[in-house]
Amino acid sequence: MENNRDKKTDDILEKLVHINRITKVVKGGRRFGFSALVVVGNQAGRIGIAHAKAKQVPDAIKKANEMARRKLIHIPLREGRTIHHDVKAKDGSGRIVLRSASKGTGIIAGGPVRAVCEVLGVKDIVAKSMGTSNAHNVIRATIKALKKQNSPKQISSIRNKKISEIVEKRG
């Protein structure tokens, strides 16, 4: 399943989501470059995203990978395989709905959302992205949605209840 664009080094999986050719108009004409959008993660609840520009594609990818590694954040996962509850988020015109799924469902998501789920370590999830197909907005909306979810531990501290009372009521 991994191809030459997906590299795994020191337990961090790097996935290239999008490459774009960019143009800067200067006095003498046009200067061409490339931008790369990358997601990295340890497949155990840590993820980072970055966007970088350079004159050559490999340089842009390398730069984005280094930036993403510096911006790793932790996302709580349920049983290490799915999210705790259904969440919705929006970024720009990109809207995303993430739904927790039962064991064995797999990753039912398209494009950029699938890359995020794979590097995060989510094995069972159903996702629907609406609005734009712009990879940047879809990924930012996905990260927003993942940050919005609350683990049973967080909910129990907010409600002043035991974790066992919260987990019992879950479907």
Where are these regions (language model features)?
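Ribosome-associated RNA-binding proteins
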Residues: 1-171
